[in-house]
Amino acid sequence: MTISYTFTRELRLLTPAQFKSVFSKPIKASSAEITLLAIPNTEQHPRIGLTVAKRFVKKAHQRNRIKRIIRDNFRLHQHELPAIDIVVLVRNGVVEMENAELHKLVEKLWRKLNRRYNG
């Protein structure tokens, strides 16, 4: 069996109801810049939803860069995560981070979330 590193529609939270369900009693993993909220899902794979507020990241190209990096990191680490729905909340300070720095932070948060879910 080969592992697929694609990021398909099935790996995303799409509806407001899916997002809202994550906010009720979530498992949290956070840093100063990013918070991950997660709940178990009924799928066989993790799903992700991203929220990058204009209040914290003013310019569209900056919001897109942040979302692209987080999505790519999720795509590469999806097989290490349990079957959970994850909402990523981006806060102030993430704009100043370099791409590599953001990748490392998100990887650290995936591990933290995994430990909290399994532990």
From Swiss-Prot:
GO terms of molecular function: 3'-tRNA processing endoribonuclease activity; ribonuclease P activity; tRNA binding
Enzyme Commission (EC) number: 3.1.26.5
Keyword match Iron: no
GO biological-process terms attached to the record: tRNA 5'-leader removal
PROSITE patterns noted in UniProt: RIBONUCLEASE_P
Subunit structure: Consists of a catalytic RNA component (M1 or rnpB) and a protein subunit.
Function, in words: RNaseP catalyzes the removal of the 5'-leader sequence from pre-tRNA to produce the mature 5'-terminus. It can also cleave other RNA substrates such as 4.5S RNA. The protein component plays an auxiliary but essential role in vivo by binding to the 5'-leader sequence and broadening the substrate specificity of the ribozyme.
Protein name: Ribonuclease P protein component
Organism, scientific name: Shewanella woodyi (strain ATCC 51908 / MS32)
Gene: rnpA
